[in-house]
Amino acid sequence: TWMVRLCLPLAVVMEKFCARLKRGTTAKTQSDHIMDIITLVQAAKAEQLIHNREELIMIHAATLSARRVKTAHVPREAVRVFDARLSLLENITTLGPKLHRSYPVSRDGTLDQLTGYIRVRELFVQNLTSPASDWRDLIRPVLHIDEKASLTQLLTLFLEKQEIAALVDDPQNQITGWITMDDVMKVLMGARV
């Protein structure tokens, strides 16, 4: 019995210590999981199982949930807009020879009077198949996303709504910019960090 009295406190301390260790190994944070992925990707690169570009894409994909829309969007002052008052030719001439895939559409040519957005590819298909059609018939409803949302949340929104662009809003619901699937791809490819 004296041996039990002597060992009991030691056994209780060891039990609590082991329980604490066990808890520490199972309760990983999101950043721990991301670091595990990055370590595995770097190990695969070191073993020459993947190339430099693949390593970069995988690391950026693993950290997508930590990146905010605000870091990848086109700021308000740089957003180019289709003006609903102008013809298709006038809009394209105004925007210049290098077009993006999509543009917000506005009643007055500013971000303050938006009516939706337009996909340039659809404009050209319509122009080829029925040139007399009005380009405004192709205006799509525009999505909105909070600038503090993660890029993973943005991609989920794009997939759920089957859209490729969104307006970026601040906490006061003021438009701060424009973001497209292309902007997210640039982050994934490492062209924008």
Regions found by a protein language model. Give the residues of each.
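Membrane-embedded alpha-helical segments of inner-membrane proteins
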Residues: T1-A43
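Soluble cytosolic regulatory domains appended to membrane proteins
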Residues: K28-V193
